[in-house]
């Protein structure tokens, strides 16, 4: 193994070990690019007015098409996953009609705040690893910026987008919160994940409410903006 390849592997190993020390369950790296096929699907989604009253999707179309449109200096993207899977099967609670049910992701603290705090602390520790040959700059994102996290997560190898629209991980299922760090430095990337759904539609069949519309549309979205 030549020195450059060894150095690249050392960098990836250090980043992964660092991510584990902050409690992240998976950490992968990719280029800050969105495949043309995904861009075309997003354009079609907007053209057909499928975004309802979420007008900001249309307003931020250009920036969502590519992380580089969001930040022109971006050269790499670190995508991290935080497992929030429950210990018990949440579907068992649905059978108890005398009890209300809260979605698993909403049972704890606001994940945006928890995850972003972890992400910022993790990002601050990247400087000693990556800042050896030039000034390092980075941006941290958790679900609140015009960034297509799920396509980036698939490109990085965390999983693939299932028919229920969520990311599916071989190890963690659909129980991953996603966060992204964009950097102005080229670092070694991971292999993308393939779509393994095939003809399977178990995620659609098992959904008790057939709620395949983004929850954001019916919960915190501003209705009169």
Locate predicted features.
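Auxiliary alpha/beta "docking" domains used to position bulky ligands
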Residues: 1-196
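Residues immediately flanking
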Residues: 80-82, 209, 222
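Cysteine-centered iron-sulfur cluster-binding motifs in ferredoxin-type domains/subunits
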Residues: 192-211
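Single conserved hydrophobic/aromatic residue that forms the stacking wall/gate
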Residues: 217-225
